[in-house]
A protein has these predicted regions:
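Charge-dense, helix-prone N-terminal extensions
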Residues: 1-145
Length: 145
């Protein structure tokens, strides 16, 4: 069975973010880092080449393939900031209030924080984290939307 490419590393998250050349993207990345620390209460970890993740989620498919990934995370890509949220965020009612964004198969992409409502983004990250933690109704665990 193929091994996961994206694994937790021991690399410094701060060093990685400080290596970002674009000052705006660097500042946004540090702001997102603080948001996710606040939401999760967990330390950030570098995953793979360019992802920052919080928490650990073990998955297993019917095929028998299993692995570990972070519960929520983000990546400061060259063209955009990618957010890795648990499945279900795309249909969250707050998505219509977020602002300028694009959705990928498993991620939410924005160009910069100024393009979105940070309070809404915060709540969507919170939703993703609580959803990945299990439970019947992640909405019930959230502060009011």
């Amino acid at each position: 069975m193929a091994e996961n490419k994206t694994k937790e590393t021991n690399e410094s998250v701060d060093d990685f973010l400080n290596s970002i050349e674009h000052e705006g993207k660097k500042a946004d990345s540090f702001r997102i880092l603080e948001m996710m620390k606040d939401i999760t209460g967990l330390p950030p970890k570098k995953w793979g080449d360019a992802m920052i993740g919080f928490g650990n989620y073990h998955y297993k498919y019917k095929s028998g393939h299993e692995g570990d990934i972070f519960q929520v995370g983000f990546s400061p890509r060259k063209s955009y900031l990618s957010f890795y949220l648990f499945y279900g965020y795309k249909h969250h009612p707050l998505m219509t209030k977020l602002g300028k964004h694009k959705g990928g198969k498993a991620c939410l992409n924005i160009n910069k924080l100024a393009d979105v409502d940070e309070d809404i983004l915060y709540k969507l990250i919170e939703f993703g984290f609580l959803s990945s933690a299990g439970g019947d109704n992640p909405y019930a665990k959230m502060e009011s939307c």
